[in-house]
């Protein structure tokens, strides 16, 4: 029986795996839903997709369903289909595969004869073999067993988006689907088995707004973008790829979708199969990405096929090698149940779409059974650096959203694109290798991947990136051999982002983390400013700033309390944000506000959430993010930041945290006096201005101007999302050199944004000063706060900081864009001078250029290092104050430029000048044009001719300009002096407060000491009393316990007695009943006996009477006989006498 049961179970498992054509209706529906949800999903665009997808049987665990389908559904599907076909072709060359995607599809179809028609659910011929193979592999973890999870359709709803990064499912794409899907380019509709993955696929469409239902960024889902760009910091690397690569919006999208689809399906695939299939799918997706730039269909298909083949081969080779990191194992184990069925569906889909058996099936079959050229080619491609990887690099640039959908891991192919997305630590690994790594990692999560993922991390295995090997996968090193390295997680180029391994799944779509998705990822000690070892210390305060000001007793309080205004809007300092999985713990001085240390990302990490820097988000951060989008700057998590498990969720939006937090922390670390002088100024000014114009930071900064990215999932997400990153000037995105997390790369990080000018977006509601940015040694918020305070003081006009900034930003906004472009081009920001609104006079320009000079910013940064605050607080405070003043001067210069324009206008019309306060920004061009118009309007009958008037006007203008310059200079001096006076007053006030506090300090100390002594005595007495009380209580308790025991004994005895009494009563009753019965019975017997006795007696009497009568008779007879006898005797005697007489007579005779 046991054998029979096991056999039946095994058969069930095989049946679950093998009937690829048998897809539970729920699954098909879920697949359909997912495809429908996918904006660019093949299902959505292809009329036949739904049909194909519906029949899709639960994807074989070994073959994850393709998860994401890009907007270029045709490309994605085709690429998926071709990806398997190209597996064969890839042996020849990726270019060849691209050249002949269609032929490959037929070829692949031939190799997979069992695949059903596009509309038919296909159980690849290889599938039985696969099933056989998979059955031995099948395990609960692989979802091979027939379980509700595998049988039930995986729902498309974005479940806590399982980090799909690795999920690139084996490209099950079947080459033939082209006829099936008119909308798609001969690409089989890819079913996203995993709900989260389906969401990724939905996101796959390049610009599709994120569909993640969770407010937190789902790594799987791109951030919704109002405009062309989605500023998904996680997907910034994608953006970078985007820029670096030719914008193959359709192809990239399709590829991205494909990648996400594959990745997603791979997640659900059982570890071993998924490893192969994922490797195939990832490679295919990588190749698709490569081909995508060239031709959306053929290129994508060919590349995808080639990548798929190589991935399949490599994955086949690598399956045993891959070992997924523990976090991946957990996540995948968790996700596998749902994911595995999806994989089956995906396989079925490809089968349905094209007669070619699903790539996954065919790949294993081809690889194992038939030495199909595809398998060999794929293996070769995997082993080789992967020619396609370069192409995938170009192809990688998908739409940000599509990139997000693909999720760096999913977009393994696309993502591999040489430009690592800024948001992700993109490693320039080959897309194929990246895809392979992602695939392998993902499948490793299910089975082999763990080993490979860990061992094969990017050649550039940044220690921190290891945490986010998913991220690494996202940026798969282009040179990695898919066969071996695909397993390695691609460390995102940003080792600092260091997402938790758990995020591998989540990260691909978005830094979720966490999520995020997410709890599996161990929190790196480096993540926290404080050492984990300190956590055991009862005195250790996880929420306190990591480094305490050496000299400032108040530091602990203020260090944690940074500008409430700034902090309020951007982040809750105590708010645990799983979104910022990596909080820079670089310098103890860095100002980190720990998210709740215990908060786990989405994954439910038990590890304390990493302290998340909560620098206030500012437009500068947005600028940084934008720059990162342009590949010039890379948003990079602090190298020490450890991935915060998310997820899933992890609320996955890592906030880009500029180095500025360090500046803030440094301020915090300054001595009390300095701190009071500097921070109080800063905060006071900010409170004055920021309070007025403070708007809930949740309003996304106007990056929408650049990126139309205003549709972040939530402002809070944006904040966290940006804050978790530090913008670091990226080395060429294509560079594959690992960046040491510890290496001080951050000087490049400090973009020189003029606070008002360079901020890419003038978001009036957003305080540029809101978050300290690395741009200036002092946080911009500090500078702006001071400037704004000064401005308000100068100009009583009650207008919030935003309003004051708008005039400054109106013109500067464009320069900031130029600046960004320049940065993207590699030109120094300083090259772009931001001048007063229309252009300032020479003096104004000179001042602006001097102020804007990067040396001032970078120089300031040089000494505004986080360590400086601790090492030399006074110097730090002084320098910080100087920086703040300098920033104020810069802002004032802009204002002066405006004022100059106003002054020139005032010279023309004093009344008009009075009408416009100096704050009003009037373009000088407009001003002069007005002046010119007024002059021209003079009656034509004027004595002077136009030339004379023009010359006179020029002279007058020159004079006006000179005067304006003088005015601006004097005004500058006045403002500076006034500002200095105000600042000094504030400083003096702070010092006075400090001194006032210090003077009574001694008395307080004495009193407190005495009080402490008294309290100590009282405490001792109380302790003694407490001890006696405790003793008495202990005695009482003992007695009580004894009494309880006695009572319990009595109770037990009573209960026993009661039971006995009841038993006896019952017995008595029973005995009585028996007695009564016996009595009745005895009575009956007695009666019967008496009757019998009476009868007997009657008979006896009768008999006795009879016997007596007979006795008498006999007696009478006896008497008669006796008489007769006596007579006889007498007669005899008489006879004898006679005889004697006779004899005697005879004798005698």
UniProtKB/Swiss-Prot annotation:
Effect of loss of the gene: Mice develop normally, are fertile, and do not present elevated tumorization rates. Cells deficient in TACC2 divide normally and do not show any change in the frequency of apoptosis induction.
Ranges of compositional bias, category Basic and acidic residues: 358-368
Top-level division of the source organism's lineage: Eukaryota
Tissue expression: Expressed in brain, kidney, lung, thymus and ovary. Not detectable in normal tissues at protein level.
Composition bias type Polar residues, residue spans: 13-35, 267-284, 300-317, 541-561, 701-716, 770-780
Subunit organization: Interacts with microtubules. Interacts with YEATS4, GCN5L2 and PCAF. Interacts with CCDC100/CEP120.
Annotated protein name in UniProt: Transforming acidic coiled-coil-containing protein 2
Organism encoding this protein: Mus musculus (Mouse)
């Amino acid at each position: 029986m046991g054998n029979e049961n096991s056999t039946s179970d095994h058969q069930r498992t095989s049946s679950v795996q093998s009937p690829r054509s048998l897809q539970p209706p729920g699954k098909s529906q879920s697949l359909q839903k997912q495809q429908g949800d996918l904006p660019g999903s093949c299902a959505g665009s292809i009329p036949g997709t739904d049909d194909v997808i519906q029949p899709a049987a639960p994807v074989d665990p070994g073959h994850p369903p393709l998860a994401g389908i890009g907007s270029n559904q045709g490309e994605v599907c085709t690429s998926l289909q071709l990806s398997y076909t190209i597996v064969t072709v890839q042996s020849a060359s990726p270019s060849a595969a691209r050249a002949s995607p269609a032929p490959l599809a037929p070829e692949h179809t031939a190799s997979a004869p069992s695949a059903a028609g596009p509309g038919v659910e296909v159980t690849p011929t290889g599938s039985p073999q696969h099933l056989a193979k998979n059955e031995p592999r099948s395990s609960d973890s692989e979802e091979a067993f027939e379980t509700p999870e595998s049988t039930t359709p995986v729902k498309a709803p974005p479940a806590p988006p399982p980090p799909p990064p690795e999920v690139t499912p084996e490209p099950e794409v079947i080459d033939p689907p082209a006829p099936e899907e008119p909308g798609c380019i001969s690409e089989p509709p890819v079913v996203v088995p995993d709900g989260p993955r389906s969401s990724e696929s939905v996101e796959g469409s390049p610009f599709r707004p994120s569909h993640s239902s969770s407010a937190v960024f789902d790594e799987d889902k791109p951030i919704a973008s109002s405009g062309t760009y989605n500023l998904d910091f996680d997907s910034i690397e994608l953006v970078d790829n985007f820029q670096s690569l030719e914008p193959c919006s359709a192809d990239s999208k399709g590829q991205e979708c494909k990648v996400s689809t594959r990745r997603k399906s791979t997640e659900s695939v059982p570890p071993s199969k998924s490893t192969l299939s994922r490797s195939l799918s990832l490679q295919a997706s990588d190749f698709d990405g490569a081909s995508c730039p060239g031709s959306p269909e053929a290129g994508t298909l060919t590349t995808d096929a080639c990548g798929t083949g190589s991935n399949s081969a490599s994955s086949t080779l690598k399956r045993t090698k891959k070992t997924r990191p523990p976090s991946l194992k957990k996540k995948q184990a968790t996700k596998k149940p749902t994911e595995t069925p999806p994989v089956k569906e995906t396989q079925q889909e490809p089968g349905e779409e094209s007669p070619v058996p699903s790539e996954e099936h065919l790949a294993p079959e081809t690889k194992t059974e038939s030495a199909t050229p595809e398998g060999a080619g794929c293996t070769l491609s995997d082993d080789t650096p992967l020619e396609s990887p370069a192409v995938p690099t170009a192809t990688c640039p998908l739409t940000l959203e599509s990139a997000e959908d693909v999720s760096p891991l999913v977009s393994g192919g696309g993502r591999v694109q040489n430009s690592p997305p800024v948001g992700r630590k993109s490693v320039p690994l080959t897309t194929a290798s990246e895809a392979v790594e992602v695939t392998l990692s993902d499948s490793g999560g299910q089975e082999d991947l763990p080993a490979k993922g860990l061992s094969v991390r990017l050649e550039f295995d940044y220690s921190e990136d290891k945490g986010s090997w998913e991220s690494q996968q996202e940026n798969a090193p282009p040179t990695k051999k898919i066969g071996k390295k695909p397993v390695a997680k691609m460390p995102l180029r940003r080792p600092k982002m260091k997402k938790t391994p758990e995020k591998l799944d989540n990260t691909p779509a978005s830094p979720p983390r966490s999520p995020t998705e997410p709890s599996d990822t161990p929190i790196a000690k480096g993540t926290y400013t404080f050492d984990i070892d300190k956590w055991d210390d009862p005195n250790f305060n996880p929420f306190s700033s990591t480094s305490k000001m050496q000299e400032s007793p108040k530091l602990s309080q203020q260090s944690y309390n940074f500008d409430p205004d700034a902090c309020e809007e951007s982040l809750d300092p105590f708010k645990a944000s799983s979104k910022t999985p990596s909080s820079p713990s670089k310098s103890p001085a860095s100002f980190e506000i720990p998210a709740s240390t215990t908060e786990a990302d989405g994954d439910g990490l038990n590890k304390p959430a990493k302290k998340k820097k909560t620098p206030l988000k500012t437009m500068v951060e947005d600028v940084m993010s934008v720059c990162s989008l342009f590949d010039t700057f890379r948003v990079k998590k602090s190298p020490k930041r450890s991935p915060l498990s998310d997820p899933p969720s992890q609320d996955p939006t890592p906030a880009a945290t500029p180095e500025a937090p360090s500046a803030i922390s440094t301020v915090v670390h300054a001595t009390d006096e300095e701190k009071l002088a500097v921070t109080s100024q800063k905060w006071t000014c900010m409170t004055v201005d920021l309070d007025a114009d403070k708007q809930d930071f949740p309003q996304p900064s106007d990056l929408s101007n650049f990126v139309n990215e205003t549709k972040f999932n939530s402002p809070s997400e944006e904040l966290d999302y940006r804050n978790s990153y530090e913008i670091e000037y990226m080395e060429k995105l294509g560079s594959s050199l690992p960046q040491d997390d510890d290496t001080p790369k951050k000087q490049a990080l400090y973009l020189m944004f003029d606070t008002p000018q360079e901020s890419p977006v003038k978001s009036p509601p957003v305080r540029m000063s809101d978050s300290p940015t690395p741009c200036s040694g002092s946080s911009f918020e500090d500078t702006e706060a001071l400037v704004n305070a000064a401005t308000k003081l100068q100009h009583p006009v009650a207008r919030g900081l935003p309003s004051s900034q708008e005039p400054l930003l109106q013109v500067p906004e464009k320069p900031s864009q130029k600046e960004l472009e320049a940065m993207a081009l590699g030109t120094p920001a300083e090259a772009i001078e931001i001048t007063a609104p229309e252009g300032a006079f020479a003096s104004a320009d000179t001042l602006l250029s001097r102020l804007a000079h990067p040396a001032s910013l970078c120089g300031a940064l040089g000494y505004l290092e986080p360590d400086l605050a601790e090492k030399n607080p006074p110097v730090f405070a002084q320098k910080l104050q100087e920086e703040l003043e300098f920033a104020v001067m810069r802002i004032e210069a802009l204002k002066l430029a405006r004022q100059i324009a106003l002054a020139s206008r005032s010279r023309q019309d004093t009344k008009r000048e009075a009408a416009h306060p100096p704050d009003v920004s009037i373009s000088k061009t407009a001003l002069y044009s007005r002046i010119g118009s007024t002059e021209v309007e003079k009656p034509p009958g004027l004595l002077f001719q136009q030339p004379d008037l023009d010359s006179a006007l020029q002279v007058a203008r020159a004079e006006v300009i000179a005067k304006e310059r003088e005015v601006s200079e004097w005004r500058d001096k006045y403002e500076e002096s006034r500002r200095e006076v105000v600042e000094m007053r504030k400083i003096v006030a702070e010092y006075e407060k400090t001194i006032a506090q210090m003077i009574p300090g001694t008395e307080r100390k004495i009193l407190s000491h005495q009080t402490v002594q008294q309290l100590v005595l009282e405490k001792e007495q109380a302790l003694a009393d407490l001890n006696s009380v405790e003793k008495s209580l202990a005695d009482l308790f003992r007695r009580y316990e004894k009494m309880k025991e006695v009572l319990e004994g009595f109770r037990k005895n009573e209960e026993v007695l009661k039971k006995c009494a009841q038993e006896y009563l019952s017995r008595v009753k029973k005995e009585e009943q028996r007695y009564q019965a016996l009595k009745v019975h005895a009575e009956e017997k007695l009666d019967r006996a008496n009757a019998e006795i009476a009868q007997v007696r009657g008979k006896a009497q009768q008999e006795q009477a009879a016997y007596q009568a007979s006795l008498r008779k006999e007696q009478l007879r006896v008497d008669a006989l006796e008489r007769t006898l006596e007579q006889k005797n007498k007669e005899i005697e008489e006879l004898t006498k006679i005889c004697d007489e006779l004899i005697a007579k005879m004798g005698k005779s």
